[in-house]
Amino acid sequence: MSSIVINVAPAGSKVFKQLQWNRVHIKKSLDEICHSLTLELPISQKDLLHKHDTIEVRFYNKHITHNNGNLRVTTVRIDEITDTTDSGRKYITVLGRSPARDIIDSTWTGTTESATLLQVAETIAKGSFGIEVQHLPRGVDYTETIPVFAWDCESPWTQLVNAAENQGYVFTSNEAGELYLTKSGRDASQWHFILAEGMNIKSVETTESGAEQFHEYIVVSSGLEGRAIDPLCNNKRILTLNLSDFKLDQEKVNRRAQIELYRRRRRTTTVTVSGWGLTDAQIKSFETTHEKELFFNPNFLIPVYIPSAGLDCTMMISEVEYRAESSVFDCTISLVNPEVYMGKEGTVFKDKKSGLKGKQKTGFNAFIEEVEQRQKAAK
């Protein structure tokens, strides 16, 4: 049995107090560096929290073998508190974002020279705001050197995200409110994540949008020009990106143009599942949960089997929305083709099947059986 505990600490403090709460909604997305939180609490909790306080959401499960059986799901700073009376019912709503909000919202002037992408991020995040930046895998720095990184009376965040994308990296907030810098696409099958119709999927929705799609993509940098043509958008729409702040070679400007094409062409499959990640049975099956991922997270590459949508492949999680009310919780997961964030390197996953096609069993028992088979194969 799992449960959710929500705590609050005053700004600048690490002394947390537990809150009573009615419902919680957490959103994590590859397109937004910060996690966002919407939290509804009884009016009795109003005096316990204030703007800029820190809120953490923790997931408790008796099968978690480390950290006293609980893990953080997110850590945010409070942006807004609203007191509401509705048909005699009184409650407060709290909105919050990850600590990286301070980098995004702040504007100042600075420069770094001859530093790697990781070092630049550390200078900005840790040096100015005390936010740790961890490269995944840990203990190494595979990022490339940026000759000059400068910003003037602005937030450096957009430049930093562009610099990461130029190198095939992505920034994400982690559960503790720090930042991860990792290559696009993390293999989640190693922790036995899987999404399959008839097993753990409650509903499926597929969306195709052309609002941000163009026929021609042009990326300009240091006198070089990269182009990509989308034959599936047969019109005169053109998008030009000026990345003159970065000295990109021809390969990189071509890659950026191609990634813009894939991203704006995207077809999103959204599924709803019970819980926020692995089932109790899956968590219990690990000898230790230390260094294991237990929650669905953006940037995961995950086996997907949804015959009704014509899907039997590996897809990337672009967004997760967790919801909970008392003891009931579920989540909505947005899936895209890996090339949307990985470029051509991600196209190989369209042929990486789930291994479920043709199997007759359905339901939870089949789900557990499939997980057990994957675990045996991994040993």
Q: Language-model segments: what does each one mean?
A:
Residues K17-L19, S128-E132, A309:
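Short secondary-structure junctions
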Residues G88-S106, S327-T347:
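Short solvent-exposed strand/turn elements
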Residues L37-P42, V94, L179-L181, V271-V273, ...:
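Generic recognition of long tandem-repeat/solenoid scaffolds
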